[in-house]
């Protein structure tokens, strides 16, 4: 999906060398025309390796989006981890969500999703994320397994006052 609302379009060709979603929060998600889009109101990180960043520092963009080209939304695996205590022992349960459920929860304002780390193989990207909500549990780790896809980053401006 081409987006003419943004000045810059960057493919994720360098696996985090130039652009990264680490610690970036999405408060809205959409899926249309086989594009899974995460809206990032506080932008994402641009490293000094990027041609547009002459600051020699890792800085944020302003509001931006990142798109993943996905053939079938049903192919995305969402694993949500919940920690709890039972009989004095700490346990972690794993719940499988479909992507539609995550989209609904984020878009309803019940939670946001924070990207923590990316792992990329020849057949998928796995994102380690955090689901943050205003009600208990306030924080749950999750994994997004997105099949063989590339990310495209859309943004307008660097915010040189927002350094890593």
PLM feature spans:
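Surface-exposed, interaction-prone regions used to assemble/regulate multi-protein complexes
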Residues: 1-164
């Amino acid at each position: 999906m081409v987006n003419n609302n943004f000045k810059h379009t960057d493919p994720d060709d360098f696996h985090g060398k130039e652009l990264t979603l680490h610690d970036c929060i999405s408060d809205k998600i959409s899926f249309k025309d086989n594009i899974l889009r995460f809206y990032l109101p506080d932008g994402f990180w641009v490293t000094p390796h990027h041609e547009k960043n002459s600051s020699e520092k890792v800085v944020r963009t302003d509001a931006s989006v990142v798109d993943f080209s996905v053939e079938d939304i049903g192919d995305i695996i969402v694993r949500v981890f919940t920690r709890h205590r039972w009989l004095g022992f700490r346990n972690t349960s794993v719940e499988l969500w479909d992507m539609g459920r995550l989209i609904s929860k984020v878009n309803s304002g019940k939670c946001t999703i924070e990207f923590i780390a990316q792992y990329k193989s020849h057949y998928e990207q796995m994102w380690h994320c955090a689901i943050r909500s205003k009600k208990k549990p306030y924080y749950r780790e999750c994994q997004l397994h997105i099949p063989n896809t590339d990310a495209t980053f859309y943004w307008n401006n660097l915010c040189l006052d927002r350094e890593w």
